[in-house]
Protein backbone atom coordinates (compact mmCIF):
# COMPACT_ATOMS: atom_id res chain seq x y z
CA UNK A 1 0.00 0.00 0.00
CA UNK A 2 1.31 3.44 -0.87
CA UNK A 3 0.52 6.47 1.22
CA UNK A 4 -1.38 9.18 -0.61
CA UNK A 5 0.78 11.96 -1.97
CA UNK A 6 0.32 15.54 -0.87
CA UNK A 7 -1.71 17.81 -3.15
CA UNK A 8 0.39 20.07 -5.33
CA UNK A 9 0.23 23.79 -4.66
CA UNK A 10 -2.25 25.53 -6.83
CA UNK A 11 -0.74 27.81 -9.46
CA UNK A 12 -1.17 31.49 -8.83
CA UNK A 13 -3.17 33.21 -11.51
CA UNK A 14 -1.63 36.04 -13.42
CA UNK A 15 -3.77 38.58 -12.85
CA UNK A 16 -5.51 40.97 -11.67
CA UNK A 17 -2.24 42.95 -11.55
CA UNK A 18 -2.97 43.90 -15.11
CA UNK A 19 -6.16 45.61 -14.00
CA UNK A 20 -4.22 48.73 -13.12
CA UNK A 21 -2.95 48.99 -16.68
CA UNK A 22 -5.30 49.49 -19.61
CA UNK A 23 -6.95 46.18 -20.51
CA UNK A 24 -6.21 44.77 -23.94
CA UNK A 25 -7.70 41.78 -25.72
CA UNK A 26 -4.49 39.65 -25.81
CA UNK A 27 -3.87 40.10 -22.08
CA UNK A 28 -7.44 39.21 -21.18
CA UNK A 29 -7.23 36.13 -23.41
CA UNK A 30 -4.00 35.01 -21.72
CA UNK A 31 -5.56 35.51 -18.26
CA UNK A 32 -8.47 33.34 -19.29
CA UNK A 33 -6.14 30.60 -20.57
CA UNK A 34 -4.19 30.48 -17.29
CA UNK A 35 -7.36 30.25 -15.26
CA UNK A 36 -8.64 27.42 -17.49
CA UNK A 37 -5.34 25.54 -16.97
CA UNK A 38 -5.82 25.74 -13.20
CA UNK A 39 -9.36 24.42 -13.55
CA UNK A 40 -8.20 21.50 -15.73
CA UNK A 41 -5.36 20.62 -13.31
CA UNK A 42 -7.77 20.62 -10.37
CA UNK A 43 -10.12 18.29 -12.22
CA UNK A 44 -7.28 15.85 -12.93
CA UNK A 45 -6.17 15.89 -9.28
CA UNK A 46 -9.69 15.25 -8.14
CA UNK A 47 -9.98 12.25 -10.46
CA UNK A 48 -6.64 10.84 -9.19
CA UNK A 49 -7.60 11.09 -5.53
CA UNK A 50 -11.02 9.63 -6.22
CA UNK A 51 -9.33 6.58 -7.79
CA UNK A 52 -7.06 6.27 -4.70
CA UNK A 53 -10.11 6.43 -2.51
CA UNK A 54 -11.74 3.59 -4.48
CA UNK A 55 -8.57 1.46 -4.18
CA UNK A 56 -8.46 1.94 -0.42
CA UNK A 57 -12.12 0.95 -0.20
CA UNK A 58 -11.46 -2.31 -2.11
CA UNK A 59 -8.39 -3.07 0.06
CA UNK A 60 -10.40 -2.49 3.20
CA UNK A 61 -13.05 -5.01 2.07
CA UNK A 62 -10.38 -7.60 1.27
CA UNK A 63 -8.65 -7.22 4.65
CA UNK A 64 -11.91 -7.79 6.46
CA UNK A 65 -12.47 -11.25 4.75
CA UNK A 66 -8.79 -12.34 4.62
CA UNK A 67 -8.55 -13.97 8.09
CA UNK A 68 -11.55 -16.21 7.37
CA UNK A 69 -9.29 -19.01 5.98
CA UNK A 70 -5.77 -20.22 6.79
CA UNK A 71 -4.63 -20.28 3.12
CA UNK A 72 -5.79 -19.09 -0.29
CA UNK A 73 -4.90 -20.32 -3.82
CA UNK A 74 -3.85 -17.24 -5.82
CA UNK A 75 -1.91 -16.29 -8.96
CA UNK A 76 1.30 -14.66 -7.80
CA UNK A 77 2.60 -11.94 -10.19
CA UNK A 78 6.06 -12.85 -11.49
CA UNK A 79 7.19 -9.77 -13.40
CA UNK A 80 5.02 -7.28 -15.28
CA UNK A 81 3.44 -9.90 -17.57
CA UNK A 82 4.04 -13.34 -16.00
CA UNK A 83 2.01 -15.02 -13.28
CA UNK A 84 2.44 -18.31 -11.50
CA UNK A 85 0.11 -20.24 -9.21
CA UNK A 86 0.78 -20.03 -5.48
CA UNK A 87 -0.69 -20.21 -2.04
CA UNK A 88 -1.36 -17.30 0.36
CA UNK A 89 -0.54 -18.30 3.95
CA UNK A 90 -0.42 -16.39 7.29
CA UNK A 91 -3.60 -14.59 6.36
CA UNK A 92 -3.72 -12.67 9.65
CA UNK A 93 -0.28 -11.06 9.25
CA UNK A 94 -0.02 -7.89 7.17
CA UNK A 95 3.14 -5.82 6.46
CA UNK A 96 2.35 -2.10 6.24
CA UNK A 97 4.58 0.56 4.64
CA UNK A 98 4.81 3.45 7.07
CA UNK A 99 6.96 5.63 4.81
CA UNK A 100 10.65 6.17 4.04
CA UNK A 101 11.10 2.38 3.63
CA UNK A 102 9.91 1.67 7.18
CA UNK A 103 7.64 -1.40 7.47
CA UNK A 104 5.60 -2.77 10.35
CA UNK A 105 3.76 -6.06 10.88
CA UNK A 106 0.19 -5.93 12.15
CA UNK A 107 -3.00 -7.96 12.13
CA UNK A 108 -5.73 -7.68 9.54
CA UNK A 109 -7.97 -5.77 11.92
CA UNK A 110 -5.23 -3.19 12.64
CA UNK A 111 -4.63 -2.85 8.90
CA UNK A 112 -8.31 -2.02 8.38
CA UNK A 113 -7.99 0.83 10.89
CA UNK A 114 -4.92 2.21 9.08
CA UNK A 115 -6.77 2.12 5.76
CA UNK A 116 -9.69 4.04 7.25
CA UNK A 117 -7.32 6.75 8.55
CA UNK A 118 -5.75 7.17 5.11
CA UNK A 119 -9.16 7.34 3.46
CA UNK A 120 -10.04 10.34 5.66
CA UNK A 121 -6.90 12.15 4.46
CA UNK A 122 -7.82 11.40 0.82
CA UNK A 123 -11.34 12.75 1.26
CA UNK A 124 -10.00 15.99 2.80
CA UNK A 125 -7.63 16.48 -0.15
CA UNK A 126 -10.48 15.96 -2.61
CA UNK A 127 -12.60 18.57 -0.81
CA UNK A 128 -9.74 21.14 -0.99
CA UNK A 129 -9.34 20.62 -4.74
CA UNK A 130 -13.08 21.00 -5.25
CA UNK A 131 -13.03 24.38 -3.47
CA UNK A 132 -10.14 25.59 -5.66
CA UNK A 133 -11.99 24.35 -8.75
CA UNK A 134 -15.15 26.22 -7.83
CA UNK A 135 -13.18 29.45 -7.16
CA UNK A 136 -11.39 29.40 -10.51
CA UNK A 137 -14.54 28.50 -12.41
CA UNK A 138 -16.11 31.75 -11.13
CA UNK A 139 -12.96 33.65 -12.16
CA UNK A 140 -13.15 32.18 -15.63
CA UNK A 141 -16.72 33.41 -15.93
CA UNK A 142 -15.66 36.92 -14.80
CA UNK A 143 -12.78 36.94 -17.28
CA UNK A 144 -15.15 35.98 -20.11
CA UNK A 145 -17.44 38.87 -19.21
CA UNK A 146 -14.45 41.22 -19.00
CA UNK A 147 -13.25 40.09 -22.40
CA UNK A 148 -16.65 40.75 -23.92
CA UNK A 149 -16.70 44.25 -22.38
CA UNK A 150 -13.19 45.04 -23.63
CA UNK A 151 -14.03 43.85 -27.11
CA UNK A 152 -17.15 46.03 -27.18
CA UNK A 153 -15.66 49.23 -25.62
CA UNK A 154 -12.14 49.04 -26.99
CA UNK A 155 -8.96 49.13 -24.97
CA UNK A 156 -10.29 51.24 -22.07
CA UNK A 157 -12.75 50.15 -19.42
CA UNK A 158 -14.26 52.43 -16.76
CA UNK A 159 -14.29 50.75 -13.34
CA UNK A 160 -16.33 52.43 -10.60
CA UNK A 161 -16.77 51.52 -6.97
CA UNK A 162 -19.66 52.80 -4.89
CA UNK A 163 -18.68 53.87 -1.35
CA UNK A 164 -21.34 54.38 1.27
CA UNK A 165 -20.68 57.37 3.58
CA UNK A 166 -22.74 56.11 6.52
CA UNK A 167 -19.98 54.14 8.24
CA UNK A 168 -20.66 53.01 11.78
CA UNK A 169 -17.97 53.81 14.38
CA UNK A 170 -17.88 51.67 17.50
CA UNK A 171 -15.84 54.11 19.60
CA UNK A 172 -16.34 57.80 20.24
CA UNK A 173 -14.29 60.10 18.07
CA UNK A 174 -11.62 61.93 20.09
CA UNK A 175 -10.81 65.58 19.45
CA UNK A 176 -7.53 67.06 20.65
CA UNK A 177 -7.78 70.25 22.72
CA UNK A 178 -5.86 73.30 21.64
CA UNK A 179 -3.19 74.49 24.10
CA UNK A 180 -4.54 78.06 24.37
CA UNK A 181 -8.22 77.57 23.69
CA UNK A 182 -10.78 79.95 25.13
CA UNK A 183 -13.35 78.63 27.61
CA UNK A 184 -16.85 77.86 26.51
CA UNK A 185 -19.41 80.60 26.65
CA UNK A 186 -21.53 78.55 29.03
CA UNK A 187 -18.72 78.54 31.64
CA UNK A 188 -18.34 82.36 31.67
CA UNK A 189 -20.14 84.17 34.45
CA UNK A 190 -21.58 87.51 33.44
CA UNK A 191 -22.45 89.79 36.32
CA UNK A 192 -25.23 92.30 35.90
CA UNK A 193 -24.67 95.49 37.89
CA UNK A 194 -26.89 97.71 35.82
CA UNK A 195 -29.35 98.33 38.64
CA UNK A 196 -26.53 99.05 41.10
CA UNK A 197 -27.44 96.06 43.25
CA UNK A 198 -24.49 93.83 44.14
CA UNK A 199 -24.98 90.14 44.78
CA UNK A 200 -24.63 88.83 48.29
CA UNK A 201 -21.56 86.68 47.57
CA UNK A 202 -19.37 89.55 46.31
CA UNK A 203 -17.05 91.54 48.63
CA UNK A 204 -15.36 94.91 48.44
CA UNK A 205 -11.58 95.20 48.33
CA UNK A 206 -11.48 96.38 51.97
CA UNK A 207 -13.60 93.46 53.12
CA UNK A 208 -11.39 91.01 51.24
CA UNK A 209 -8.19 92.42 52.76
CA UNK A 210 -9.75 92.38 56.22
CA UNK A 211 -10.77 88.77 55.73
CA UNK A 212 -7.25 87.84 54.56
CA UNK A 213 -5.67 89.51 57.59
CA UNK A 214 -8.05 87.65 59.89
CA UNK A 215 -7.13 84.34 58.27
CA UNK A 216 -3.41 85.13 58.63
CA UNK A 217 -3.87 85.84 62.34
CA UNK A 218 -5.70 82.55 62.74
CA UNK A 219 -2.86 80.71 60.98
CA UNK A 220 -0.25 82.32 63.23
CA UNK A 221 -2.29 81.46 66.31
CA UNK A 222 -2.77 77.86 65.19
CA UNK A 223 0.94 77.57 64.39
CA UNK A 224 1.87 78.77 67.90
CA UNK A 225 -0.61 76.39 69.51
CA UNK A 226 0.69 73.45 67.50
CA UNK A 227 4.28 74.27 68.44
CA UNK A 228 3.56 74.18 72.21
CA UNK A 229 4.50 70.79 73.68
CA UNK A 230 2.10 69.39 76.25
CA UNK A 231 4.29 69.00 79.33
CA UNK A 232 3.19 67.01 82.36
CA UNK A 233 5.06 67.41 85.68
CA UNK A 234 4.67 64.53 88.12
CA UNK A 235 6.78 64.03 91.30
CA UNK A 236 9.19 66.74 90.20
CA UNK A 237 10.00 65.01 86.88
CA UNK A 238 9.45 66.14 83.31
CA UNK A 239 7.38 63.88 81.06
CA UNK A 240 7.25 64.93 77.45
CA UNK A 241 5.89 62.74 74.69
CA UNK A 242 8.38 61.42 72.19
CA UNK A 243 6.49 62.95 69.29
CA UNK A 244 6.73 66.46 70.74
CA UNK A 245 10.44 65.96 71.40
CA UNK A 246 10.93 65.00 67.76
CA UNK A 247 8.97 68.05 66.62
CA UNK A 248 11.01 70.29 68.92
CA UNK A 249 14.26 68.80 67.59
CA UNK A 250 13.31 68.97 63.89
CA UNK A 251 11.74 72.43 63.76
CA UNK A 252 13.14 75.57 65.34
CA UNK A 253 9.76 76.96 66.41
CA UNK A 254 9.01 78.71 69.69
CA UNK A 255 8.58 76.34 72.63
CA UNK A 256 6.21 77.48 75.38
CA UNK A 257 6.40 75.49 78.61
CA UNK A 258 3.58 76.10 81.10
CA UNK A 259 5.03 75.77 84.62
CA UNK A 260 3.60 75.91 88.12
CA UNK A 261 4.69 78.27 90.89
CA UNK A 262 7.57 76.02 91.85
CA UNK A 263 10.93 77.44 90.81
CA UNK A 264 12.44 73.96 90.65
CA UNK A 265 9.94 73.03 87.95
CA UNK A 266 11.09 75.98 85.82
CA UNK A 267 14.66 74.75 85.91
CA UNK A 268 13.51 71.25 84.93
CA UNK A 269 11.55 72.75 82.06
CA UNK A 270 14.53 74.56 80.72
CA UNK A 271 16.68 71.45 81.02
CA UNK A 272 14.22 69.41 78.97
CA UNK A 273 13.99 72.15 76.34
CA UNK A 274 17.76 72.40 76.05
CA UNK A 275 18.23 68.65 75.76
CA UNK A 276 15.75 68.37 72.90
CA UNK A 277 17.37 71.00 70.65
CA UNK A 278 20.38 70.17 68.44
CA UNK A 279 23.86 71.73 68.76
CA UNK A 280 23.01 73.11 72.15
CA UNK A 281 21.09 76.06 70.71
CA UNK A 282 17.80 77.03 72.32
CA UNK A 283 15.51 78.74 69.85
CA UNK A 284 13.18 81.27 71.49
CA UNK A 285 12.56 79.41 74.73
CA UNK A 286 9.56 80.61 76.72
CA UNK A 287 9.54 80.31 80.52
CA UNK A 288 6.37 81.06 82.49
CA UNK A 289 6.91 81.40 86.27
CA UNK A 290 3.98 82.42 88.54
CA UNK A 291 1.93 83.33 85.48
CA UNK A 292 4.52 85.72 83.97
CA UNK A 293 6.13 84.83 80.67
CA UNK A 294 9.72 85.74 79.85
CA UNK A 295 11.15 85.09 76.40
CA UNK A 296 14.86 84.52 76.02
CA UNK A 297 16.70 84.68 72.73
CA UNK A 298 19.93 82.95 71.80
CA UNK A 299 21.88 86.02 72.86
CA UNK A 300 20.35 85.90 76.33
CA UNK A 301 21.27 82.23 76.57
CA UNK A 302 24.86 83.05 75.67
CA UNK A 303 24.98 85.69 78.42
CA UNK A 304 23.54 83.21 80.89
CA UNK A 305 26.17 80.67 79.91
CA UNK A 306 28.88 83.28 80.59
CA UNK A 307 27.37 83.86 84.03
CA UNK A 308 27.43 80.12 84.61
CA UNK A 309 31.13 80.07 83.74
CA UNK A 310 31.82 82.61 86.49
CA UNK A 311 29.94 80.50 89.03
CA UNK A 312 31.63 77.28 87.91
CA UNK A 313 34.24 77.28 90.65
CA UNK A 314 31.68 77.47 93.46
CA UNK A 315 30.45 74.33 95.23
CA UNK A 316 26.92 73.11 94.53
CA UNK A 317 25.87 72.15 98.04
CA UNK A 318 22.20 71.38 97.42
CA UNK A 319 19.63 71.14 94.71
CA UNK A 320 17.81 74.35 95.65
CA UNK A 321 20.72 76.42 94.33
CA UNK A 322 19.84 75.23 90.86
CA UNK A 323 16.11 75.63 91.34
CA UNK A 324 16.31 79.33 92.30
CA UNK A 325 17.51 80.56 88.92
CA UNK A 326 16.53 79.20 85.50
CA UNK A 327 20.12 79.71 84.32
CA UNK A 328 21.32 76.37 85.73
CA UNK A 329 20.67 73.15 83.84
CA UNK A 330 22.00 69.61 83.54
CA UNK A 331 25.48 69.93 81.99
CA UNK A 332 25.26 68.84 78.37
CA UNK A 333 27.67 69.42 75.50
CA UNK A 334 26.39 69.14 71.94
CA UNK A 335 29.22 68.63 69.51
CA UNK A 336 29.89 67.67 65.92
CA UNK A 337 33.01 66.14 64.46
CA UNK A 338 35.62 68.73 63.52
CA UNK A 339 35.95 69.36 59.79
CA UNK A 340 38.91 71.45 58.73
CA UNK A 341 39.75 72.53 55.16
CA UNK A 342 43.43 71.57 55.18
CA UNK A 343 44.88 68.78 57.28
CA UNK A 344 48.16 66.97 57.49
CA UNK A 345 48.07 63.29 58.38
CA UNK A 346 51.00 62.04 60.47
CA UNK A 347 51.43 58.30 60.65
CA UNK A 348 52.61 57.27 64.12
CA UNK A 349 53.46 53.72 63.05
CA UNK A 350 50.80 51.80 64.99
CA UNK A 351 47.68 52.14 62.85
CA UNK A 352 47.14 55.66 64.16
CA UNK A 353 47.12 58.89 62.19
CA UNK A 354 47.12 62.34 63.78
CA UNK A 355 45.48 65.22 61.94
CA UNK A 356 46.81 68.78 62.25
CA UNK A 357 45.67 71.99 60.64
CA UNK A 358 48.54 73.82 58.97
CA UNK A 359 47.12 77.27 59.65
CA UNK A 360 46.50 76.63 63.35
CA UNK A 361 49.90 75.05 63.95
CA UNK A 362 51.66 77.90 62.12
CA UNK A 363 49.83 80.47 64.24
CA UNK A 364 50.81 78.63 67.42
CA UNK A 365 54.47 78.52 66.38
CA UNK A 366 54.44 82.29 65.73
CA UNK A 367 52.95 83.00 69.15
CA UNK A 368 55.53 80.77 70.85
CA UNK A 369 58.47 82.32 68.99
CA UNK A 370 57.23 85.84 69.86
CA UNK A 371 56.66 85.06 73.55
CA UNK A 372 60.04 83.39 74.05
CA UNK A 373 61.49 79.95 74.28
CA UNK A 374 60.22 79.42 77.86
CA UNK A 375 56.64 80.45 77.08
CA UNK A 376 53.86 78.27 78.38
CA UNK A 377 52.55 75.87 75.75
CA UNK A 378 48.93 76.54 74.94
CA UNK A 379 46.68 73.50 74.82
CA UNK A 380 44.15 73.23 72.00
CA UNK A 381 40.47 73.53 72.82
CA UNK A 382 38.67 70.20 73.01
CA UNK A 383 35.43 70.43 71.06
CA UNK A 384 35.22 66.92 69.63
CA UNK A 385 36.79 63.49 70.26
CA UNK A 386 39.25 64.16 67.43
CA UNK A 387 40.71 67.11 69.37
CA UNK A 388 41.81 64.84 72.23
CA UNK A 389 44.67 63.46 70.16
CA UNK A 390 46.12 66.97 69.73
CA UNK A 391 46.72 67.24 73.46
CA UNK A 392 48.88 64.12 73.62
CA UNK A 393 51.93 65.39 71.72
CA UNK A 394 55.49 66.15 72.77
CA UNK A 395 57.16 69.52 72.17
CA UNK A 396 60.64 69.24 70.69
CA UNK A 397 62.37 72.52 69.73
CA UNK A 398 59.06 74.34 69.64
CA UNK A 399 57.37 71.78 67.36
CA UNK A 400 54.73 69.17 68.05
CA UNK A 401 55.85 65.55 67.78
CA UNK A 402 53.06 62.94 67.88
CA UNK A 403 53.22 60.08 70.32
CA UNK A 404 52.94 56.42 69.41
CA UNK A 405 50.29 55.98 72.09
CA UNK A 406 48.22 58.47 74.05
CA UNK A 407 48.65 56.32 77.19
CA UNK A 408 52.44 56.61 77.23
CA UNK A 409 54.76 59.60 77.34
CA UNK A 410 57.89 59.59 75.17
CA UNK A 411 59.54 62.50 76.97
CA UNK A 412 58.30 63.26 80.48
CA UNK A 413 60.10 66.59 80.65
CA UNK A 414 58.96 68.03 77.32
CA UNK A 415 55.51 66.42 77.30
CA UNK A 416 52.56 68.73 77.23
CA UNK A 417 50.35 66.26 79.09
CA UNK A 418 52.89 64.82 81.50
CA UNK A 419 51.40 63.87 84.84
CA UNK A 420 54.70 63.14 86.63
CA UNK A 421 55.99 66.67 87.17
CA UNK A 422 56.31 68.12 90.66
CA UNK A 423 53.89 70.93 90.04
CA UNK A 424 51.21 68.55 88.87
CA UNK A 425 51.72 66.36 91.95
CA UNK A 426 51.37 69.37 94.24
CA UNK A 427 48.24 70.49 92.44
CA UNK A 428 46.83 67.00 92.81
CA UNK A 429 47.20 67.18 96.59
CA UNK A 430 45.55 70.61 96.64
CA UNK A 431 42.75 69.28 94.55
CA UNK A 432 42.19 66.31 96.84
CA UNK A 433 41.96 68.57 99.85
CA UNK A 434 39.47 70.78 98.04
CA UNK A 435 37.33 67.77 97.18
CA UNK A 436 37.32 66.66 100.83
CA UNK A 437 36.09 70.08 101.96
CA UNK A 438 33.40 70.04 99.29
CA UNK A 439 32.17 66.61 100.35
CA UNK A 440 31.95 67.70 104.00
CA UNK A 441 29.87 70.73 103.05
CA UNK A 442 27.55 68.50 101.06
CA UNK A 443 27.10 66.19 104.05
CA UNK A 444 26.13 69.14 106.26
CA UNK A 445 23.62 70.34 103.70
CA UNK A 446 22.09 66.87 103.50
CA UNK A 447 21.53 66.61 107.25
CA UNK A 448 19.93 70.02 107.43
CA UNK A 449 17.01 68.90 105.21
CA UNK A 450 14.85 70.82 102.77
CA UNK A 451 13.54 73.36 105.35
CA UNK A 452 16.97 74.68 106.33
CA UNK A 453 18.36 74.98 102.80
CA UNK A 454 17.59 78.67 102.54
CA UNK A 455 19.16 79.39 105.97
CA UNK A 456 22.34 77.57 104.98
CA UNK A 457 22.49 79.62 101.82
CA UNK A 458 22.14 82.89 103.73
CA UNK A 459 24.51 82.02 106.60
CA UNK A 460 27.10 80.17 104.55
CA UNK A 461 27.65 81.87 101.23
CA UNK A 462 29.48 80.00 98.53
CA UNK A 463 33.24 80.16 98.74
CA UNK A 464 34.93 80.69 95.39
CA UNK A 465 37.58 78.18 94.44
CA UNK A 466 41.22 79.25 94.12
CA UNK A 467 41.99 81.17 90.95
CA UNK A 468 44.48 78.56 89.80
CA UNK A 469 41.99 75.67 89.99
CA UNK A 470 39.14 75.23 87.50
CA UNK A 471 36.44 72.66 88.00
CA UNK A 472 36.37 69.91 85.38
CA UNK A 473 33.29 69.17 83.35
CA UNK A 474 31.71 65.83 84.23
CA UNK A 475 28.37 66.09 82.51
CA UNK A 476 27.01 64.41 79.37
CA UNK A 477 28.25 64.74 75.80
CA UNK A 478 25.76 64.13 72.98
CA UNK A 479 26.72 64.02 69.33
CA UNK A 480 24.25 65.93 67.17
CA UNK A 481 23.93 63.18 64.54
CA UNK A 482 22.50 60.74 67.06
CA UNK A 483 19.85 62.73 68.97
CA UNK A 484 17.88 59.72 70.20
CA UNK A 485 16.45 59.13 73.68
CA UNK A 486 17.63 55.52 73.54
CA UNK A 487 21.30 56.51 73.37
CA UNK A 488 22.96 56.68 76.78
CA UNK A 489 25.10 59.82 77.21
CA UNK A 490 28.63 59.35 78.35
CA UNK A 491 30.76 61.59 80.53
CA UNK A 492 33.60 63.69 79.20
CA UNK A 493 35.94 66.40 80.47
CA UNK A 494 35.92 69.85 78.91
CA UNK A 495 38.95 72.11 78.53
CA UNK A 496 39.33 75.11 80.75
CA UNK A 497 39.02 77.48 77.76
CA UNK A 498 35.48 76.25 77.07
CA UNK A 499 32.50 77.52 79.14
CA UNK A 500 31.84 74.88 81.77
CA UNK A 501 28.33 74.08 82.91
CA UNK A 502 27.76 73.38 86.60
CA UNK A 503 26.63 69.85 87.28
CA UNK A 504 23.31 69.34 88.96
CA UNK A 505 23.90 67.15 91.99
CA UNK A 506 21.21 65.14 93.71
CA UNK A 507 21.18 65.26 97.51
CA UNK A 508 21.81 61.72 98.81
CA UNK A 509 19.44 60.27 101.38
CA UNK A 510 22.15 59.23 103.80
CA UNK A 511 25.33 60.97 104.85
CA UNK A 512 28.35 59.34 103.24
CA UNK A 513 31.89 60.51 103.07
CA UNK A 514 33.21 60.95 99.55
CA UNK A 515 36.37 58.87 98.95
CA UNK A 516 39.52 60.43 97.57
CA UNK A 517 39.37 60.72 93.77
CA UNK A 518 42.23 60.18 91.39
CA UNK A 519 43.33 63.05 89.17
CA UNK A 520 43.25 62.33 85.44
CA UNK A 521 45.90 63.37 82.95
CA UNK A 522 43.64 66.07 81.54
CA UNK A 523 43.22 67.73 84.93
CA UNK A 524 46.91 67.31 85.76
CA UNK A 525 47.88 68.98 82.49
CA UNK A 526 45.46 71.84 83.16
CA UNK A 527 46.72 72.30 86.71
CA UNK A 528 50.31 72.22 85.47
CA UNK A 529 49.53 74.91 82.92
CA UNK A 530 47.84 77.10 85.52
CA UNK A 531 50.85 76.81 87.84
Swiss-Prot record:
Record has Membrane as a keyword: no
GO biological process: cellular response to growth factor stimulus; cellular response to steroid hormone stimulus; negative regulation of intrinsic apoptotic signaling pathway; negative regulation of phosphatase activity; negative regulation of transcription by RNA polymerase II; regulation of cell growth; response to virus
Composition bias type Polar residues, residue spans: 257-266, 280-296, 414-424
Gene3D superfamilies to which the protein is assigned, alphabetical: 1.10.287.370
Residues carrying N-acetylmethionine: 1
Domain of life: Eukaryota
Residue ranges, annotated region (Disordered): 1-24, 224-381, 408-470, 500-531
Keyword Ribonucleoprotein: no
Tissue expression notes: Expressed in the spinal cord, ganglia, choroid plexus and olfactors epithelium of the developing brain. Expressed in skin, lung, kidney, testis and muscles (at protein level). Expressed strongly in brain and kidney. Expressed weakly in skeletal muscle, lung and liver.
Function: Involved in gene transcription regulation. Acts as a transcriptional repressor in concert with the corepressor UXT to regulate androgen receptor (AR) transcription. May act as a tumor suppressor to repress AR-mediated gene transcription and to inhibit anchorage-independent growth in prostate cancer cells. Required for cell survival in ovarian cancer cells. Together with UXT, associates with chromatin to the NKX3-1 promoter region.
PANTHER family recorded: RNA POLYMERASE II SUBUNIT 5-MEDIATING PROTEIN NNX3, UNCONVENTIONAL PREFOLDIN RPB5 INTERACTOR 1
Protein's name according to its UniProt entry: Unconventional prefoldin RPB5 interactor
Organism: Mus musculus
Amino acid sequence: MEPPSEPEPEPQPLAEASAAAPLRAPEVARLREEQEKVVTNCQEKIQHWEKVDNDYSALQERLRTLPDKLSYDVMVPFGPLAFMPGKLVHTNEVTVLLGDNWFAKCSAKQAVGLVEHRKEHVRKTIDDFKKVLKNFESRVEFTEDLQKMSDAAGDFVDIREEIKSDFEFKGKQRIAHKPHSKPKTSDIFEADFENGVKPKNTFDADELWARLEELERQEELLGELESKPDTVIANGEDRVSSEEEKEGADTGVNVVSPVTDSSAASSCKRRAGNAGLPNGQVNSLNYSVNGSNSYHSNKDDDEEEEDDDDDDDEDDDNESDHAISADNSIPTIYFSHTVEPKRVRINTGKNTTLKFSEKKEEAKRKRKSGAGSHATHELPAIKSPADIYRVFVDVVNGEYVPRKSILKSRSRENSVCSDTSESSAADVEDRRGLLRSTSSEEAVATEAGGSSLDELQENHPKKPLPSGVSEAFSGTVIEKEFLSPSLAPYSAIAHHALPTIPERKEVPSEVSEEPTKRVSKFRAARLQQRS
